[in-house]
Amino acid sequence: MAGVYSQVTTGTEFWSSVFGRSGPVEIEIGPGTGAFLLQEAARRPQVNFVAIESSRSRAENLEALVRSRGLTHVRVVHAPAQCVVHHIVPTRSVAAYHIYFPDPWWKRRHHRRRLLTPAFARDVARTLVPGGLVAFATDVDFLWTMAIQCFVGSAGLTLRESAPPFRRSTRTRFEEKGLRRGATIYEGWFELPAEAGVAANASASTSTCGNSSNVGPTEPAQER
């Protein structure tokens, strides 16, 4: 996707180049086996979906499922999510992010690998369209606290109190494990205010994300 970004000037042009069509864009970070993504992509064909997965094997498996089901409006990216959102995703171009049961990285030496940071939350907020949402779920209480601190405290999103526009009808493997041990599930929707503006210097850079690569096609997939 980084190669496409260097050829266009707006978020609309960027995503149209990636998908070969216009439409709202939703991004799932850490899709795992892809249960949510595959179901939502089949249910809402008018939406363009991006899956960002840090595990190459999971990304390749998901890409194979996407292709086998003919979901031409889905792209799978193998890369660190923080890098993709910071360097590649254009400002005010994403309708929703889906972040379900991210790894808590319990060991102290692994804390730097955690997804949630104030900087990441601000990047997410920059890329959301006004009224855009971050759907977040976890069974780890401190991650829920971190989500509120990052998305509300650092990024200026609001914790939505009214009913969300969508609800998950699938459960992740980690969610199932949490429910079996009686864990509390924390779930919420963080919203960018409809009147949100854009900082004068807010933009994605054209840098690439290390040695990571797209598993999904960067050219629009052919209809089958």
Regions found by a protein language model. Name each.
Residues 1-27, 35-44:
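S-adenosyl-L-methionine
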Residues 116-130:
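A short glycine-rich, Lys/Arg-flanked "PGG" loop and its adjoining helix->strand segment in the class I
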Residues 130-138:
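Conserved beta-strand signature within the Rossmann-like core of class I S-adenosyl-L-methionine
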